[in-house]
Design a protein with these regions (language model features):
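Absolute protein N-terminus
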Residues: 1-2, 84
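C-terminal structural segments of small proteins and small subunits
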Residues: 53-84
Length: 84
């Protein structure tokens, strides 16, 4: 199983997103964004299970919670941006 990381520029926005996901029954964990993924800002992410990522993306968009990008670590340990 893989995890997806929704990156945010602020911890406040990440925590707002976490509350939205919790209300929708989607488990998430607020974590520091891995250094290699940080673009700018303080670098926090919501880590969600890959099988709930599509629902999480939809819930965040519906609630107008703006994330920066979504990343997933592949089987070789390389990070890639999720664009689907």
């Amino acid at each position: 199983m893989y995890d997806d990381y929704f990156t945010f520029r602020s911890v406040t926005t990440a925590m707002r997103g976490s509350r939205i996901l919790e209300a929708m029954g989607i488990q998430s964990l607020t974590v520091r964004t891995p250094k290699q993924l940080q673009q700018q800002g303080c670098g926090y992410s919501l880590r969600v299970r890959g099988d709930t990522a599509a629902r999480a993306k939809h819930a965040l968009k519906q609630a107008e919670i703006q994330y920066s990008r979504i990343y997933r670590k592949d089987e070789n340990g390389q990070w890639r941006e999720v664009t689907e």
